[in-house]
């Protein structure tokens, strides 16, 4: 799968789940379960409830995603 196939969307973290998973509400109102990308995990970037994040979704499963950026 090419990297360009992923969909990036903005959202807000609503809930923290076990194993570094988060429930994120996207700007269009959809709810997504997302995990932290490897670079964010490696650099110890903390994500809290209420943070604005960028979520990367694949076109195959739009209910799961990867958090790739935390806005300030």
From Swiss-Prot:
Cystine bridges: none
GO molecular function, one term: rRNA binding
Keywords (A to Z) from UniProt: Cytoplasm, Initiation factor, Protein biosynthesis, RNA-binding, rRNA-binding
Domain S1-like residues, every copy: 1-72
Annotated localization: Cytoplasm
Matches recorded under InterPro entries: NA-bd_OB-fold, RNA-binding_domain_S1_IF1, S1_domain, TIF_IF1
Cellular component, GO, one term: cytosol
Family the entry assigns: Belongs to the IF-1 family.
Subunit structure, as described in the record: Component of the 30S ribosomal translation pre-initiation complex which assembles on the 30S ribosome in the order IF-2 and IF-3, IF-1 and N-formylmethionyl-tRNA(fMet); mRNA recruitment can occur at any time during PIC assembly.
Biological role stated in the UniProt entry: One of the essential components for the initiation of protein synthesis. Stabilizes the binding of IF-2 and IF-3 on the 30S subunit to which N-formylmethionyl-tRNA(fMet) subsequently binds. Helps modulate mRNA selection, yielding the 30S pre-initiation complex (PIC). Upon addition of the 50S ribosomal subunit IF-1, IF-2 and IF-3 are released leaving the mature 70S translation initiation complex.
Listed name of the protein: Translation initiation factor IF-1
Species the sequence originates in: Salmonella paratyphi A (strain ATCC 9150 / SARB42)
Gene giving rise to this polypeptide: infA
